[in-house]
Structure formats: structure tokens, C-alpha cells
Amino acid sequence: MKFSKPKFSMPKWRLTKEDFTPKGMWRNFKNFIVIEAKPGTTLAERFLTNEDLYPVPKSQRVWGPWNYVAFWLADSVNVNTWMIAGTAVESGLSWWEAWITVWVGYTIAAFILTIAGRAGAVYHISFPVLSRSSFGIWGSLWPILNRAVMACVWYGVQAWIGGECVTLMIRSIWPSFSHIPNTMAKSGTETYQWVGFFIFWLISNVAIWFPVYQIRHLFTAKSFLAPPAAIAFLIWALVKAHGAGDAIHAKTQLSTWNHGWAVTAGIISCLDNFATLIVNNPDFTRFATTPNAPIFPQLITIPMGFGITTLIGVLVGSASKSIYGENIWNPLDLLKSFLDHSNHHGVRAGVFFISTGLCLAQLGVNIAANTVSAGNDTSALCPMFINIRRGGYIASIIGICMCPWNLLSSSNSFANSLSAYAVFLSSFAGILIADYFVIRKGYLKVDALYTINPNEPYWFTYGINLRAFASYICGLLINVVGLAGAVGDKVPKAALTMNNIAYLLGIVTSFLSHLIICKIFPVTACGEKFLDERPEETDNYLLTLESTEDTISSYEETEGIPVKKVSYDSKEKSDDGKSGGIDIKESSVF
């Protein structure tokens, strides 16, 4: 099954006078915004499916183990990860204790992420489609909506951070750039900062255009450029400070009780950092060449890559105190200080190189964690009108409209709110993992995930699995008081203490609750033993998509409306020379 490369093509009509009437213009507009559907798809099914939601065809399963190594190695280098260990040091831990907590945290995160993405690698389906098996055909819209909202918010935040990288790049070339007149004072930002943000936003829009299975090349490029930039930053800071500074020699002064909770908070912060990636990991594992391709790259590369990045962050932050008298954990703030204190061409060249690497790092993180997720999620919310590409651009527009500089101006409350929101995502993750691994034992009826039929196993109660929502509420209730405290309300101290492990409480509680509820009220379509071989469900379902018409590649008039159709050809072969099933020839759509 082979998709052709996407192209931008406008429907070609022979214009008549009627096309310029209100009725004609409305008809043409509707034809443009409606996503093409497989011939024979009913109107009801069009609210469940489009080409981006179907299982990935064989020709697009091109992510091998080394692609996942490059992906996670590239993703590990970003501004947020850089500062995690520094935050733990600020809480009172020694540098090596902070680093160990990071290794432990990301090892746990890698394990949870790997099992959460298993269904995507086996059945080649995305998170929104997988959610239908647990929450029901219509019930899945709730976790999808939650994930989509988070993706849009985080897109704007990460884009603003990427814009700061662009600003540093421009400042290193034209030092006077930061002194241009501020015409945006009332908006809460500086003109030069907004220009950097807008440039990064435009660059991101170019990356959004490409289909997901092709953007692996972006992460490969990032894996070769971003880590060397981080290492160069480390060497530069150590040389400039004549060592790593005093922070690495400091010992913890915390009591045993506070020391234990500081370690715990450091571990959980890593899980919070991965909350979104854990849930939407099937969006990437679905492109795996084999079900096992992502396993070891994720289990090994994530703790190693993220651990090394945080180590660099701690050493650079410690060195900054010897240079400027204070620990500067944010790498962008330290680069700004370099430019503020020196106009030497060597300093400017170094800042430009490092800022370019960090800019590429932020671009990759934003595409992986937010754009792809928002595209998949919004596509599932309204598949008749939105595909992954359009969904990505929707997130991009929301990201700039939400004025992320205003959110970050009150950084503490905003960061606490986003961290608290990880509780919602942890409950979703616990249910998805319990449902797939324990209850269904790895078996999914793929065709039923795309069907509105009361007789199918994922219809449950009018399309909603009440068991999953009961489990979801259990996962929230155990954290609801601590959640209120995290956003500023007065709550008992015990609740605040529990909030330090909110993610683990949420995922474990929802996991166990779902097992118990489904034991009392069993679901159908479950395996008798765990599926330990590659199922034929996905490929068999793809074969059923073959139309009775062998080739449909042009616009045809249906009741006077031009309708775009998709052609199917079962004779194409995949890249490895084996039969690739159906060939969907996409005359693609924006």
C-alpha cells in the first residue's frame, strides 16, 4: 500500500456564471474543505475516518530502530530537559543526587512510554483510534479533546522558546537588534522578541507541511546538530569558568524526610515532562517497520539521551555561578548574558552556533510532541474536514493567537497548571495500558474501530464505555485535592505531599480501577491468551478498503458537486520488494 508524495492541488472547475453566485461559491467552498473519502463510505462513517486515521500502509512503515534512536536522541536535547536537574539542585539535592533522580525518572518514563506505544507498533494505528477500543467510538472524543487542547497550548509555549533561540541568532549577527523601538509594549512583550517568535513560527509551518512518515529526516538531522551544540556549550562554559563551579561540590542540607520527597519530586518531574509523549506515542510507533523496532531504542536511548542532556545542564549551570555570580540554569538566559557582557566576534559566533542547535532542537520537540499530536487529535475530532496537516496548522494558529508570552510572564502559576494537567493524561494512560495488555491481551478488532455498529465490540453503551470513564474518575479523584493546591488553592498539607507523586497515583489508580471494573462487568472481543505473534488484523482490514472501482483518480460530478476520490491499486509493491497491498494514490489535499 503506497501513498504518493503529497502535493498541493486545487480543485479544477470550469468556471461558469453560476460559480460566482452565492450558491455556487458556497458549493465550491464546501467541496474544498471536505476531506476526500473512500468510495462507499457512509456519511456516519465519515465522522470516524479519513486517510490519516486508517492504519499505516506497508509502504509508509519506514521507521526502523535507528530512526527511533535518532528520534529520541534528538528529542532529548531541548531547553526544558536541560533545566530539570538544575531544578532538583535548587530544591536542595546535590548535583549527583539530582542526576540519579533524572536517570531513574526517565527510565521509568521510557518503560511506560514503550508499553503505551506497543499497540501502535503492532496494529499501526494512532492514539485517537486506539482510544476507541478503551473509551468507545464516541467516548474516545474526550481523551482526544484533552490531548488536542494540551498540544495546542504547548505548541505556543515551545514556539515562544524557539523564538528566543532565533532572537539570539539574530542578536549574534546584529547586536543592535535587541535595541529596536518597542512598538508592542502594551502586549506584554518586546518587538524584537516577537519578531524572533514569528520567524520560528513561520519555519515551523514549513515543517508541518510534510507527512509524519517523512519527518524522520528532520530528527536525523537534529540528532547530528543539536547534541554537538550542547557539548560545545558545555566546553565553552567550563573553559570560561575555569571549571565546573561550586555547585557540584555542594552537599545536601535537607532533613531525611525532605530529602526523600525532593528525590521523589525529581523523579516525578521527569514523568510529568513525558506525560504527553506517553499518551501519544502510538502516533509515532505506528510507522515502525516491525512491532519490535521501537522497543530497545526507546528503553535505552531515552534515559541515556535525557540523562546526558541534564548532566550538561547541571554542569553549565554550575559553571555560570563562577562566571556571573549566580546559577543560571536556563541555557538561553546564559547565552543572553554572554552577549550582554561581550561584543567580541568569537562570542557572537559561538552564541550563533549554539542557538542554531537549540533552535533546531525546539523545532523537533514542537513537531514531535505537539504538532503531530494536534494533527492526529483534531483529525479524529472532525475527520470529515480536518486531516493531520490541517490539524497541525490549526495548532499553529492557536499557538500564535493565545499570546504565549503572556502565559510565560506568570511562569510559576502557568507551569504549575500545566504540570497539574499531567494528572488527566496519567489517568488516560493507565486505562489504555490496562485495556490493551491485561483485559484484551493485545487483541484488537481493527475494522470495528472504524465502524458505527451497535453489534461491534467498541460500541459499548451508545458508543461510550462507561467502565473506562468510571476508571478515569477514580484516577482523578485521588488527586483532585492536590490538583487544587497545585494551582493555588489552600488545601491540607497531606494533599500537597500526595501531589508530589500525582502522576504515579493517577496512572496506577486508573489502571487498577479499570481492571477491577472490567472484571465485574466484562467486555467482549478479548484474547484468551496474550497475543505473542504479529496479527493479520491490520493488513486484512487494509485489503477491505479496496474499492470495486480499480482506478478512481479524477473529479466526478455528483449532484452537481465536484467530488474528489481516491484510487486503489493492489498491484504495487513495498520498498522491500514484497507485496505492499493496496496503493492509495493521493492527489492530495491541503
From Swiss-Prot:
Residues 1-68, 116-124, 171-194, 240-258, 320-390, 440-467, 522-590 are cytoplasmic. GO terms for biological process: nucleobase transport; uracil import across plasma membrane. The chain crosses the membrane at residues 69-89, 95-115, 125-145, 150-170, 195-215, 219-239, 259-279, 299-319, 391-411, 419-439, 468-488, 501-521. Residues 566-590 are annotated as: Disordered. Keywords: Cytoplasm, Membrane, Nucleus, Transmembrane, Transmembrane helix. PANTHER family: ALLANTOIN PERMEASE-RELATED, NCS1 FAMILY PURINE/PYRIMIDINE TRANSPORTER. Belongs to the purine-cytosine permease (2.A.39) family. Residues 90-94, 146-149, 216-218, 280-298, 412-418, 489-500 are extracellular. The keyword Nucleus applies. This is Uncharacterized permease C29B12.14c. InterPro entries: NCS1, Pur-cyt_permease, Uracil/uridine/allantoin_perm. It is a multi-pass membrane protein. Pfam families: Transp_cyt_pur. The keyword Cell division does not apply. It is found in: Cytoplasm; Nucleus; Membrane. GO terms for molecular function: nucleobase transmembrane transporter activity; uracil:monoatomic cation symporter activity. GO terms for cellular component: cytoplasm; nucleus; plasma membrane.
